[in-house]
Regions:
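A domain-level signal for caspase-like cysteine endopeptidase catalytic cores
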Residues: 28-123
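Generic hydrophobic alpha-helical segments
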Residues: 85, 89, 126-130, 180, ...
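Solvent-exposed polar/charged
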Residues: 90-91, 131-132, 155-156
Length: 218
């Protein structure tokens, strides 16, 4: 879809892995409000099994330990279908949206249909959806393989979007989420939380710390 991606500036996250891409825009700040983190999990029965329950459990545990946990409200939706995504965005008006599941690169993200089988949602459709909710959402995390394509598109509308530039293993995905949300719920910035998430992968000896990528609008 149209323009805005070619002038991105990529800055490497020194010593801790990861890379950050900047786009031009303005971030909306909403200080003093309780932030809602919405987790959308999908693992269609026709796809390989993921450890989504462990990932969400670690996110929740990090939130409970956090110094500023009272500033965050965690909402979860499982086996998500297309209608579950937009309905959850309408119902909860989250500031952070976290997708856990499978990605298909240029094909899109893999949600579930009415029978639990895989339904692909295109990059363009996702970008347009998040554009509609851009006034509330500050950060989107796509913890799915090959989701950098979607992250680039969504980052035209959302201040911070994290995707994966290749396949990512379950353990690395869980470690990244653990570090990211531990930092975020301690009051750190999204960029710091991203860097810590990458570093936690590295600290655990997993050679995938460069897989998560952060796309930014400034």
């Amino acid at each position: 879809f149209g323009g805005g991606l070619v002038d991105a500036e990529t800055v490497n996250a020194h010593q801790i892995g990861g890379n950050i891409t900047n786009y031009t825009s303005q971030q909306q700040q909403k200080p003093g409000l309780v932030k809602t983190i919405l987790i959308l999990a999908a693992n269609p029965k026709t796809t390989s099994r993921l450890r989504l329950d462990e990932e969400v459990r670690e996110i929740d545990a990090g939130l409970q330990r956090a110094k500023k946990r009272e500033q965050f409200d965690l909402k979860q939706r499982w086996a998500v279908r297309v209608q579950d995504v937009y309905q959850s965005l309408l119902d909860f008006k989250p500031q952070v949206v976290h997708f856990s599941g499978h990605g298909s690169g240029d094909g899109g993200l893999e949600l579930e249909d009415e029978t639990g089988k895989m339904q692909l949602v295109s990059t363009e459709a996702l970008a347009r959806l998040f554009e509609l909710f851009a006034s509330n959402i500050e950060c989107v995390v796509l913890n799915a393989c090959y989701s950098e394509v979607q992250a680039m598109a969504i980052a035209l509308h959302i201040p911070y979007v994290i995707g994966m530039n290749k396949a990512i293993g379950d353990k690395a995905a869980i470690k990244f989420a653990t570090g990211f949300y531990s930092a975020l719920c301690a009051g750190e910035s999204v960029e710091f939380a991203y860097k810590l998430g990458c570093n936690v992968i590295q600290l655990d000896g997993i050679p995938e710390s460069l897989t998560p990528v952060l796309k930014k609008k400034l």
